[in-house]
């Protein structure tokens, strides 16, 4: 039991008690909704039962569920109502008949129009939904192709009968109508340019020939000497004959020296005696400085024994000769190999 020692039993409580399920709960004796519930008897069969009263339905929603549906709305487990059907009603859809796949739609030896109409009635059942036209068009195309084959075969047979009959036969085209290919005629080759000396001599009457014309022996008959080149020596009248040629020039007499053979006189070099003030060696005419001056080397004497060298300015370094143990005396007037710091002497 709950006991409250701070407050007396006669004092009223300031707290308002509410049922746990809310104000609509029937724990504290609240009123129940007067709408009847639909009780489903799942064990009883309702095949032959009468339809229920459509007016007696529970359309009242409890709590927040009352805002979900307005009016007669299906419950869970039932088919939802499409908004398009609710606004515009049930759409009218044409019934598409099934195709008979066991029956062939290609006619052979029948009237094409009647078969096409019958096939259209069979396949479409009087309705057209835009799909059965392909079958009818295919059958019509096949039937038209068969009809064309029949017509072509019939026309061919008629043509054969007419050609084999006693009618007037068409004359075959003669082969002479096609002109033969013309024979190729090669153009004549033009003759090459012939010189006057190649032409044969011919006689023609031209009248009297002057006496000073010695080139002609007969009338209009050219001498062979006239038909040769102008430098021929047989024709004295030609200006370029061998008789009128100038004498051969004396080719042994030189006309003049070629410029390559002309040599200029040697000039005396004035810089041979010039010397370099730093090294004291001559420049040998090279005053420009492009070539290094040659260093004079004295190669007299034996560098090992010191024999053959001339006495120079370092004679004061020469010591007295001594013959210790018969060793030869080495001339000290030269620089030992490697310098004085080598320690050889």
Curated annotation (Swiss-Prot):
One of its GO terms (cellular component) is cytosol. The modification Phosphothreonine is found at residues 35, 92, 96. It comes from the Eukaryota. GO terms for molecular function: microtubule binding; structural constituent of cytoskeleton. It is found in: Nucleus; Cytoplasm; Cytoplasm, Cytoskeleton; Cytoplasm, Cytoskeleton, Spindle. The keyword Ion transport does not apply. Residues 1-14, 146-164, 212-226, 315-326 have a biased composition (Polar residues). Residues 132-145 have a biased composition (Low complexity). Binds to all microtubule populations. This is Microtubule-associated protein Jupiter.
């Amino acid at each position: 039991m709950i006991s409250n020692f701070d407050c007396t039993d006669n004092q009223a409580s300031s707290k308002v008690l509410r049922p746990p399920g809310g104000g609509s709960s029937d724990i504290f004796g609240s009123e129940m909704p007067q709408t009847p519930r639909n009780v489903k008897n799942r064990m009883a069969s309702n095949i032959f039962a009468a339809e229920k009263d459509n007016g007696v339905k529970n359309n009242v929603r409890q709590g927040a569920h009352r805002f979900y549906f307005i009016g007669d709305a299906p419950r869970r487990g039932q088919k939802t109502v499409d908004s398009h059907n609710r606004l515009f009603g049930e759409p009218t859809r044409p019934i598409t008949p099934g195709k008979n796949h066991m029956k062939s739609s290609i006619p052979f030896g029948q009237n094409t129009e009647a078969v096409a109409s019958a096939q259209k009635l069979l396949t479409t059942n009087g309705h057209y939904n835009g799909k059965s036209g392909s079958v009818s068009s295919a059958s019509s195309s096949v039937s038209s192709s068969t009809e064309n084959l029949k017509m072509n075969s019939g026309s061919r047979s008629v043509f054969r009968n007419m050609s084999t009959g006693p009618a007037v036969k068409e004359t075959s085209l003669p082969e002479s109508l096609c002109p033969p290919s013309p024979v190729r005629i090669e153009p004549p080759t033009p003759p090459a340019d012939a010189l006057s000396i190649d032409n044969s001599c011919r006689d023609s009457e031209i009248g009297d020939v002057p006496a000073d014309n010695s080139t002609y022996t007969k009338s209009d008959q050219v001498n062979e000497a006239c038909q040769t080149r102008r430098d021929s020596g047989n024709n004295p009248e030609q200006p370029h004959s061998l008789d009128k040629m100038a004498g051969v020039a004396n080719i042994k007499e030189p006309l003049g020296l070629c410029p390559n053979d002309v040599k200029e006189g040697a000039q005396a070099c004035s810089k041979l005696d010039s010397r370099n003030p730093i090294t004291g060696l001559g420049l040998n005419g090279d005053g420009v400085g492009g070539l290094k001056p040659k260093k004079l080397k004295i190669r007299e004497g034996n560098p090992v024994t010191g024999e053959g060298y001339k006495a120079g300015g370092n004679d004061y370094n020469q010591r007295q000769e001594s013959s210790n143990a018969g060793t030869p005396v080495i001339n000290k007037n030269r620089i030992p190999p490697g310098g004085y710091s080598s320690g050889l002497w």
